[in-house]
Swiss-Prot record:
Changing residue 90 to N: Decreases current 4-fold in KCNH2/KCNE3 channel. It comes from Homo sapiens. This is Potassium voltage-gated channel subfamily E member 3. Expressed in hippocampal neurons (at protein level). Widely expressed with highest levels in kidney and moderate levels in small intestine. Ancillary protein that functions as a regulatory subunit of the voltage-gated potassium (Kv) channel complex composed of pore-forming and potassium-conducting alpha subunits and of regulatory beta subunits. KCNE3 beta subunit modulates the gating kinetics and enhances stability of the channel complex. Alters the gating of the delayed rectifier Kv channel containing KCNB1 alpha subunit. Associates with KCNC4/Kv3.4 alpha subunit to form the subthreshold Kv channel in skeletal muscle and to establish the resting membrane potential (RMP) in muscle cells. Belongs to the potassium channel KCNE family. The gene is KCNE3. Keywords: Brugada syndrome, Cell membrane, Cell projection, Cytoplasm, Disease variant, Glycoprotein, Ion transport, Membrane, Potassium, Potassium transport, Transmembrane, Transmembrane helix, Transport. It is a single-pass type I membrane protein. GO terms for molecular function: potassium channel regulator activity; transmembrane transporter binding; voltage-gated potassium channel activity. Residues 78-103 are cytoplasmic. The keyword Transit peptide does not apply. Residues 32-53 are annotated as: Disordered.
Length: 103
């Protein structure tokens, strides 16, 4: 009976992802020119009329910027709220201030 290692499936899936990424990066699809090699007006018109691969890239950039802003905003709010809690539970405010007011 053969025992399976839990990292083998993880390693295989990681290898498959890296292999696909490598194939995508080294493929000629990204650098391949259009059907015409020369400066043909029909080629330019076809290229302009076809939907591009990066048409919604600005939406992706805005989405990432929004997520970054939400993350930074939550960190700032969390920090300022924790400072307010620390000020209220400060020993000066709890013990010394009350005793000075009694004198």
């Amino acid at each position: 009976m053969e025992t399976t290692n839990g990292t083998e499936t993880w390693y295989e899936s990681l290898h498959a992802v890296l292999k696909a990424l490598n194939a995508t990066l080294h493929s000629n699809l990204l650098c391949r020119p259009g059907p015409g090699l020369g400066p043909d007006n029909q080629t330019e018109e076809r290229r302009a009329s076809l939907p591009g691969r990066d048409d919604n890239s600005y939406m992706y950039i805005l989405f990432v910027m929004f997520l970054f802003a939400v993350t930074v905003g939550s960190l700032i709010l969390g920090y300022t709220r924790s400072r307010k809690v620390d000020k209220r539970s400060d020993p000066y405010h709890v013990y010394i201030k009350n005793r000075v007011s009694m004198i």
